[in-house]
């Protein structure tokens, strides 16, 4: 009887705990290759984010996660091989060198990864491809509707799924098949740098963070603090580890249930589950709409009335707009790879409404910087704010001055992240959105103010 050789393609399921697909592989094949394809900046992303590299914080967190996964696999007799090749290229190279019988891969939400899987299935039809939903609370058969009939709003989705019983998370696998040898592939070493961030990548760090959170009383007041802008305690901060699959949503839900059994359930503990359901909705939203996630018109046909101004986008990216609260949030993102949920809504509203920019530029830039980037949540939320997604009320615009007064009344957040730059950014010559016109002729700040703020005419003359 010929031996069975498996290929486990890790995507956003970078863990060994609560990984039923890895457990399945351990029981079905005789030898195993564990592969990860390091993400690259695609032409689409380079065009819209105007970036050629990942943010340093994002890259550091990912590398830490990969190193931790490799260590966990080594205790089970396995190794994580990391390649810079695109997924289809990497899998095709391996399949032409090794008689792989089975491929194991998460039921990913991203359309690029799903396209690679479809091509492999078409080109290597004799290979069995096994998929499970490792990034979600529910599997597709558990949904009370066909995926094509996904509810058009989150509220409709929540009402249909929140009472469904969830299976308990699995533990660690006891053993994995030995490594399959005798193949060649371009590989890369993962270099981890000293960590100076509140977020340490990896399954073990993620589990420790979740355990520490539920060992405190913070969950019982989450709903009252969740709109904070800075610090570690105002929200759960589960998202970085959830995004890479270092911790599963089922594991967090089980911890939440244990917390409620000891401390009691209230609106705040329910709201943690509520937020997990938002994430769940956007996972299935991405699965449902695929490439429409990245279209200018979103999931509909109506295009927003926005354009692209290179200077405005640079100001937004660098935190140099006329809006201090936006500047502080963007500088926080650029330095840490993280931004609060409230902050994300404010900077997105600013980009779409105050700056009049195509929402995809903001979504793409977030993808290059966020340590907790999740394809469904990121692009789905940007569509939501731009009025081309799952919000029946259309686009959302926030009063930035009012929001700053509500969530940063003493200006401490702005002062922390902008520092002395605040005075410069608020100076008269920096109030203009544009310093050049449509054909790149310079615009004097005084001329801009006379046109757009005629009430300042006397003081500027």
Curated annotation (Swiss-Prot):
PROSITE patterns cross-referenced by the UniProt entry: PHR_CRY_ALPHA_BETA
Q: Which ranges of the sequence are coiled-coil?
A: none
Give the family per the record.
Answer: Belongs to the DNA photolyase class-1 family.
**Cofactor or coenzyme needed:** FAD; (6R)-5,10-methylene-5,6,7,8-tetrahydrofolate
Query: Mind telling me what this protein is named?
Result: Cryptochrome DASH
Gene Ontology biological-process annotations: photoreactive repair
The organism is Vibrio cholerae serotype O1 (strain ATCC 39315 / El Tor Inaba N16961)
Q: Name one GO molecular function term.
A: DNA binding
Which keywords label this protein? Chromophore, DNA-binding, FAD, Flavoprotein, Repressor, Transcription, Transcription regulation
Q: What PANTHER family does its record include?
A: CRYPTOCHROME, CRYPTOCHROME DASH
Domain Photolyase/cryptochrome alpha/beta: residue ranges: 4-137
Which residues pair up as cystines?
Answer: none
Q: Which InterPro entries match?
A: Cry_DASH, Crypto/Photolyase_FAD-like_sf, Crypto/Photolyase_N_sf, Cryptochr/Photolyase_FAD-bd, Cryptochrome/DNA_photolyase_1, DNA_photolyase_N, Rossmann-like_a/b/a_fold
Role summary: May have a photoreceptor function. Binds DNA; probably functions as a transcriptional repressor. Has no photolyase activity. Upon purification from either V.cholerae or E.coli an approximately 60 nucleotide RNA is associated with the protein.
């Amino acid at each position: 009887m010929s031996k069975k050789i498996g290929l486990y393609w890790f995507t956003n399921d970078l863990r060994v705990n609560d990984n039923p697909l890895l457990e399945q592989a351990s029981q079905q094949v005789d030898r195993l290759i564990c592969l990860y394809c390091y993400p690259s900046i695609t032409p689409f992303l380079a065009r819209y984010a105007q970036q050629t590299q990942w943010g340093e914080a994002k890259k550091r967190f990912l590398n830490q996660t990969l190193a931790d996964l490799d260590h966990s696999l080594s205790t089970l007799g396995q190794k994580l091989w990391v390649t810079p090749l695109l997924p289809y290229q990497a899998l095709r190279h391996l399949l032409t060198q090794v008689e792989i019988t089975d491929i194991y891969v998460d039921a990913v939400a991203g359309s690029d990864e799903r396209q690679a899987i479809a091509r492999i299935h078409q080109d290597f039809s004799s290979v069995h491809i096994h998929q499970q939903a490792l990034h979600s609370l529910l599997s597709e058969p558990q949904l009370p509707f066909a995926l094509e009939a996904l509810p058009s709003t989150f509220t409709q989705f929540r009402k249909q799924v929140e009472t469904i019983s969830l299976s308990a998370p699995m533990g660690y696998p006891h053993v994995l098949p030995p490594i399959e040898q005798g193949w060649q592939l371009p590989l890369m070493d993962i270099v981890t740098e000293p960590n100076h961030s509140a977020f340490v990548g990896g399954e073990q760090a993620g589990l420790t963070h979740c355990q520490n959170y539920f060992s405190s009383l913070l969950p019982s007041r989450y709903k009252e603090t969740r709109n904070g802008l800075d610090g570690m305690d105002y929200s759960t901060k589960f998202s970085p580890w959830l995004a890479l699959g270092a911790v599963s949503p089922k594991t967090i839900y089980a911890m939440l249930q244990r917390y409620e059994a000891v401390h009691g359930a209230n609106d705040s503990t329910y709201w943690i589950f509520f937020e997990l359901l938002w994430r769940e909705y956007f996972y299935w939203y991405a699965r449902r709409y695929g490439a429409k996630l990245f279209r200018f018109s979103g999931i509909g046909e109506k295009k927003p009335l926005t354009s692209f101004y290179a200077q405005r986008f640079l100001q937004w990216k660098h935190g140099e707009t006329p809006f201090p609260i936006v500047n502080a949030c963007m500088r926080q993102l650029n330095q840490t790879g993280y931004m609060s949920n409230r902050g994300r809504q404010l900077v997105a509203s600013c980009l779409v409404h105050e700056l009049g920019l195509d929402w995809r530029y903001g979504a793409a830039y977030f993808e290059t910087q966020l340590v907790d980037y999740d394809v469904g949540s990121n692009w789905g939320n940007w569509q939501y704010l731009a009025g081309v997604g799952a919000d029946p009320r259309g686009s959302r615009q926030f009063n930035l001055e009012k929001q700053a007064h509500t969530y940063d009344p003493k200006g401490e957040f702005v002062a922390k992240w902008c520092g002395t730059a605040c005075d410069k950014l608020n100076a008269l010559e920096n109030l203009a959105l544009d310093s050049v016109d449509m054909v790149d002729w310079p615009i004097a700040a005084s001329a801009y103010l006379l046109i757009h703020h005629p009430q300042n005419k006397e003081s500027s003359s």
